[in-house]
A protein has these predicted regions:
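Short, charged amphipathic alpha-helical "coupling" segments at sensory-output junctions
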Residues: 283-294
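Alpha-helical transmembrane segments of multi-pass membrane proteins
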Residues: 22-42
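Interfacial "cap-and-anchor" motif at the non-cytosolic start of specific transmembrane alpha-helices
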Residues: 59-60, 166-283
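Metal-dependent catalytic cores of enzymes that make or break cyclic nucleotides
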Residues: 298-378
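Individual alpha-helical transmembrane segments in multi-pass integral membrane proteins
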Residues: 17-28, 46-140, 242-255
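Short, Lys/Arg-rich, polar N-terminal cytosolic tail immediately upstream
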Residues: 1-15
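Membrane-interfacial loop-to-transmembrane alpha-helix junctions, especially the N-terminal start
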Residues: 17-25, 78-90, 146-156, 211-223
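Aromatic-anchored segments of alpha-helical transmembrane domains
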Residues: 30-35, 92-99, 160-168, 224-234
């Protein structure tokens, strides 16, 4: 299967409405599965295995930390807030979920404790908050982070790692055996707020994915909505039952998809920009242009090499046409088609002889007729 450096493999890029339905199913199917499982005890069996649980959360942590490493490395060079915030959200999931596994009763003699239940909620709430802040580059948090990205990256990362290590070593510390007053209400509020936030952020990235079919945008949709499904399972699933294991599966799927997007992007471009640079794109026009195949850009480059006089004309026409389409709120597929058609409107020039295109003087009637016929070659 061939692919484009700008996004998904071609077969995947053509999912169209079917892909949209599959993504929307992520919002519905987990909830239905949870309700059925909780209503029919036979479908929600007890599956107690602390060691296997540690393996699963370690896999989640590895995927999240891989994404964090890539986005943090890019953030140091780029200096914008979005990659810093996404890196911090993934660091929180990575270290806290690993701490969740290490505080599980029965692992290395760990006693019953509250941190095994607290860490997943804190990690996913942090992830949701970071994604929401990253989606608003003009917001106060983004402006603060952009002012000193290295400090904004380093200090929270170290704090999260140290705090996770502390409770993993001794899960009885910091009220690890006794609930603090109001803890249940705070937990519920965090779960609800995080789920709503991830629903909205996922919808934003879904819109961007529809415009450009960009791999990293699809990864953010999956990570957002699968994490939202995980929160639902975390809230209503019963400890050690299948309904509780579901949230681990959703998290692993979401962060594995994000890790795949990063690795595939890097393999295709051999640069961090190619791997995660799409997370800094905010202009819808950029998403549309970013989603066009490399062959199209190469073709227009060949046309403009033949006619330097109109260099950049195709890109300008495509930009204006696309902005009009966006203002008219056309469907994403129509906007992408409009951009592509406008970008290619002068491709017929490639069949016009160079002696005519680059003639220093006036064109004779026959030459002028050939120039006027160039759209026929489009």
């Amino acid at each position: 299967m061939t692919s484009s450096a700008h996004g998904l493999p071609r077969g995947f890029r053509r999912l169209g409405r079917r892909g949209s339905f599959l993504l929307l199913a992520l919002l519905v199917v987990p909830g239905i599965a949870l309700m059925v499982g909780r209503s029919v005890p036979a479908l929600d069996p007890i599956l107690e295995s602390p060691v296997f649980h540690l393996y699963v959360v370690s896999a989640i942590a590895a995927c999240a930390l891989l994404v964090a490493l890539a986005t943090a490395s890019y953030a140091v060079r780029d200096g914008r807030a979005a990659p810093v915030l996404i890196a911090l959200g993934c660091v929180a999931v990575g270290f806290m979920m690993l701490g969740h596994g290490l505080t599980t009763p029965g692992i290395f003699g760990r006693p019953p404790n509250l941190w095994v239940a607290r860490l997943p909620v804190l990690s996913l709430a942090t992830f949701a908050g970071c994604l929401a802040a990253a989606a608003r580059p003009e917001g106060a948090v983004s402006r603060l982070v952009a002012g000193s990205p290295r400090v904004a990256l380093g200090f929270p990362m170290a704090s999260i790692a140290l705090a996770s290590a502390a409770v993993a070593i001794d899960p009885t510390v910091l009220s690890g055996t006794t609930p603090v007053p109001g803890e249940g209400q705070v937990r519920t509020a965090l779960l609800v707020a995080s789920a709503v936030t991830l629903l909205i952020v996922g919808a934003l990235h879904w819109r961007r994915w529809l415009l450009g079919r960009d791999r990293i945008e699809l990864a953010l949709v999956l990570a957002s909505w699968l994490t939202m499904s995980a929160l639902l399972s975390l809230a209503y699933g019963q400890f050690w039952r299948l309904s509780w294991w579901d949230y681990h599966v959703y998290l692993l799927a979401g962060f594995a998809a994000a890790a795949w997007a990063v690795v595939a992007g890097y393999r295709g471009s051999r640069t961090l920009t190619g791997a995660v640079g799409g997370i800094t794109v905010r202009d819808p026009l950029e998403h549309v242009a970013h989603g066009q195949p490399d062959a199209l850009h190469a073709l227009i480059g060949a046309v403009e090499a033949k006619d330097p006089y109109t260099h950049g004309h195709s890109a300008r026409v495509a930009e204006l046409s696309t902005r009009i389409g966006l203002l008219l709120t056309l469907e994403p597929d129509a906007v992408r088609g409009l951009h592509q058609g406008a970008f290619l409107h002068d491709v017929g020039k490639i069949s016009v002889p160079d002696r005519i295109l680059n003639k220093p003087g006036d064109l004779d009637p026959e030459e002028w007729e050939q120039i006027q016929r160039h759209p026929e070659g489009d």
